[in-house]
Amino acid sequence: MAMPNFGDMMKQLQEAGAKMQDLQKQLEKLVSEGEAGGGMVRAKVNGRQKLLELTIDPEIMDDVDMVQDLVVAAVNKALEASAQLAQSEIQKAAGGMINPADLMKQFGGQG
């Protein structure tokens, strides 16, 4: 079995690290939205799962229980959409990165 080229592997790891930093920045810029109650409550989150904005229609403010339920629903929908979008971006960014299974095989491990 040929010995792995550590110089190439280190270069690949550095490139992967740079890609991950770029990806983190991209995820912060991605915005997903969720709404509940026919749009009475709207939530916006970024690709890093940070709540950016929460909008509540003033007409529903008298019903605290309903507002609470709608806020939870809207935020959860926004987080779900954000997670799906982030996963898609991560998969795109991971193209060409080191595959951990391949790395293990190079060292004689099982991948």
From Swiss-Prot:
GO cellular component: bacterial nucleoid; cytosol
Pfam (any one): YbaB_DNA_bd
Keywords: Cytoplasm, DNA-binding
An example molecular function term from Gene Ontology annotations: DNA binding
Domain of life: Bacteria
This protein's record includes keyword Cytoplasm: yes
Record's keyword annotation contains Isomerase: no
Compartment(s) of residence: Cytoplasm, Nucleoid
Known partners and oligomeric status: Homodimer.
Family listed: Belongs to the YbaB/EbfC family.
Function description: Binds to DNA and alters its conformation. May be involved in regulation of gene expression, nucleoid organization and DNA protection.
PANTHER family for this protein: NUCLEOID-ASSOCIATED PROTEIN YBAB (PTHR33449:SF1)
Name listed for the protein in its UniProt record: Nucleoid-associated protein CT0805
